[in-house]
Every structure is written in structure tokens, then in C-alpha cells.
């Protein structure tokens, strides 16, 4: 069984190297073989120019295809896997087109695993851990009012006036600023057209407490079921969101104002111009330390008083091992690949696992990747 790893971009390398160093049978595919050789040429000579047809020729039943390529490749590669009786893993959100492959994958006994990077990925693991711990606690009561928040962000380790730096093309970040979000605030559905319309402050329970700016991201509501909340639980707040350094909204206010005016093809062209400019002005320098902060919080209240309240908090930054972002995206992917090979993940289209044994193993590994990882109990 061969791991067919496609894509050797910035966020892919630590997980790929981990698998090769562990002795797994790994073939590497990348559009630029030179870049792949720079990344892993010291460990392997099994490097191929990425081509879907060439991959199809060598793909065998039981192999695992890993897509660390741009998102539009995930579904075509997953479909190829189904046709060849192979498994598939990516770190990306499950698109409707991917979800549509679930029944076929189940019928064939094949795993199509997604959402197992950082966010989505590690955040899911933390959420599953907290929900399971709450269920097992003496404070559990279906009548409690529950508040769930999950905030993640990549930020510069050393803050800059722009309050942000880019690890790769800024276009994705800029496009996300044009995306609506859906969450629950104070028992009501909150629909927001632009992130800056729902900015709030968040006090992260780090060893040295720190305040960040946060805003809802995408559609949080489907994750209520994904995180195994019972349908009859009373949900006061449920937000999955993005975290930024304090002062970010002030530093970006002119960008927000311009994005508000952009429309159609001309707007897309201007967004690309802005992306190119920001890449010139605000990209990480070679060797510069990045930082990732992730806080997943679950609180249960009775009559307005907290009866259970814990936060899973992580703080990680770039070091001699490379960037925090690359470690935290790609190593969970590598763990999921091993779980697929070990038949520990059910067939079908699935996000990050919720099995307690896998949670313990994966989060244990995250503890080695991050400089700080802790479950904070606010009531002790």
C-alpha cells in the first residue's frame, strides 16, 4: 500500500517528511519536481511530476492519495480513488461535491478523510474532547444553556503595524473577507454579510492572558451536529471563527472599505492586484517566526451561573522545525493517513475523527508540535 502524496507546498512538508522518515512507502507528486526535490530530495528519489493520468496508471487498490494541492483538485482525485479502490485524505473543508461521494465510498469500504489539518482539523479534535468530557461530567444536564466558541488564527510572532503577515498568496484571505457567515448568538441565528460587521474582543486564557479580535467564519451551524451536540440541547452561543491580533481592524479599515465597493470581474481583478501588493509588502521573510493561536471553549450554565467551563488552548510558533502553520496542518494529515492504513477510520466521507483513542493519540502529538497546549478549567 503506497501513500501517493500530491503537493509539496509550504504547509505540506513536515507531515510528508514524517511519513518518509517513519519508513512508509511514499511516492511524491508535485507540479514542480525541483521544488519537491528541495523539500524532500534528501529523503527520497521517488518524486514525480504531478499528472492525474500518470497517477491513475500507478494507483493500486488500498493506496492512499493525499491532496495537498489547490482545493479544486480534491474532488477529482477522490473520484479517481473510488474508481481505483484507493483511499483519500485532505486537510480541506468537505465541499458538497465531496459529500456526494459518501454513499459510493461506504459501499466500497473506502475512506475519504477531510478536515484533518489545523482549522479545520485540530479544532475539531479539541471540540470532540470537550463535548465528551462535558457529557461524562457530573454537571451534565440537557437543560443547561451551552456556549461554544472556537477561534483560530495565524498571526506574526512579532506583531507588525499591519497586524498580519502572509505565508502564501493573500488572495484566499481577501476572498474570505467577502464571505458571509452564520452562527448562533444569544439563542438566535446570526447572519453576517461581512466579517467586520461582527468583530468582537476575545480574552484568550494563555499563560500570559492576551486579548485578540475575533469574528465568525463561514457557516458554523452544521458543526453543531458534527460535534455531537444532542438535538435537544439548549444552545445559547455557537461560533467557529477567525482570530486576529488586537488592532487588526484598525490597521485594515481602508481595506475593508475598498472591499465593500468591489463587484464583478473588475472587483475580482482589483482583489488580485491587492493580493499581489500585499504579498510584496507583508509576506513572511525567510526564517521569520509565525504564530498560531487556537482556543476552543465550551461553557454550560444553569440560571445564568456557569456549572462547567473549559477551554482547550494552543499557542505555537515557528522554530528550528520550521513554521508553526506547516507543522500543525500537515502532521495531523500524516496521522490520519496512518489511521486509514491501520483501518481505524470508518468508510465514507468523514472529517477529523471523534474516536476517543484517536483523539488521545492525535492531541498527544499536537502537544509535541505546539509550545503550549492546555485544557483550562475556569471553575477550579
Where are these regions (language model features)?
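Conserved N-terminal Rossmann-fold NAD(P)-binding element of oxidoreductases
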Residues: 3-8
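NAD(P)-binding Rossmann-fold cofactor-contacting core
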Residues: 26-39
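Rossmann-fold cofactor-recognition segment
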Residues: 41-54
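N-terminal Rossmann-like NAD(P) cofactor-binding module of classical short-chain dehydrogenase/reductase
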Residues: 63-68, 89-90
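ADP-ribose/adenylate-binding Rossmann-like module
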Residues: 80-98
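Rossmann-fold NAD(P)-binding glycine/threonine-rich loop
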Residues: 92-112
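C-terminal catalytic/substrate-binding lobe primarily of soluble NAD(P)-dependent oxidoreductases
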Residues: 133-380
Amino acid at each position: 500500500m503506497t501513500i501517493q502524496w500530491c503537493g509539496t507546498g509550504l504547509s505540506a512538508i513536515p507531515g510528508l517528511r514524517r511519513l518518509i522518515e517513519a519508513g512508509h512507502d511514499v511516492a511524491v507528486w508535485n507540479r514542480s519536481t525541483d521544488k519537491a526535490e528541495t523539500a524532500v530530495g534528501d529523503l527520497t528519489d521517488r518524486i514525480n511530476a504531478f499528472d492525474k493520468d500518470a497517477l491513475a496508471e500507478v494507483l493500486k487498490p488500498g493506496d492512499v492519495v493525499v491532496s495537498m494541492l489547490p482545493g479544486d483538485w480534491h474532488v477529482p482525485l477522490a473520484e479517481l480513488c473510488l474508481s481505483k479502490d484507493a483511499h483519500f485524505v485532505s486537510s480541506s473543508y468537505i465541499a458538497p461535491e465531496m459529500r456526494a461521494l459518501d454513499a459510493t465510498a461506504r459501499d466500497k469500504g473506502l475512506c475519504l478523510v477531510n478536515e484533518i489539518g489545523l482549522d479545520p482539523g485540530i479544532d475539531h479534535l479539541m471540540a470532540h474532547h470537550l463535548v465528551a468530557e462535558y457529557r461524562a461530567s457530573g454537571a451534565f444536564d440537557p437543560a443547561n444553556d451551552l456556549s461554544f466558541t472556537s477561534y483560530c488564527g495565524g498571526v506574526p510572532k512579532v506583531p507588525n503595524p499591519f497586524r498580519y503577515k502572509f505565508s502564501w498568496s493573500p488572495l484566499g484571505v481577501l476572498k474570505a473577507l467577502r464571505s458571509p457567515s452564520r452562527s448562533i448568538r444569544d439563542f438566535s441565528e446570526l447572519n453576517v454579510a461581512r466579517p467586520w460587521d461582527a468583530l468582537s474582543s476575545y480574552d484568550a486564557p494563555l499563560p500570559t492572558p492576551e486579548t485578540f479580535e475575533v469574528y465568525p467564519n463561514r457557516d458554523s451551524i452544521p458543526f453543531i451536529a458534527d460535534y455531537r451536540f444532542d438535538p435537544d440541547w439548549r444552545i445559547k452561543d455557537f461560533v467557529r471563527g477567525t482570530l486576529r491580533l488586537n488592532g487588526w481592524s484598525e490597521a485594515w479599515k481602508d481595506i475593508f472599505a475598498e472591499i465593500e465597493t468591489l463587484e464583478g470581474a473588475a472587483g475580482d481583478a482589483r482583489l488580485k492586484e491587492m493580493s499581489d501588493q500585499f504579498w510584496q509588502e507583508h509576506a513572511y521573510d525567510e526564517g521569520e517566526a509565525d504564530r498560531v493561536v487556537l482556543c476552543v471553549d465550551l461553557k454550560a450554565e444553569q440560571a445564568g451561573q456557569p456549572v462547567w467551563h473549559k477551554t482547550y488552548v494552543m499557542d505555537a510558533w515557528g522554530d528550528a522545525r520550521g513554521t508553526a502553520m506547516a507543522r500543525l496542518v500537515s502532521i495531523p494529515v500524516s496521522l490520519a493517513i496512518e489511521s486509514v492504513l491501520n483501518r481505524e477510520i470508518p468508510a465514507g466521507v468523514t472529517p477529523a475523527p471523534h474516536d476517543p483513542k484517536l483523539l488521545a493519540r492525535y492531541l498527544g502529538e499536537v502537544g509535541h508540535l505546539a509550545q503550549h497546549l492546555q485544557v483550562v478549567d475556569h471553575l477550579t
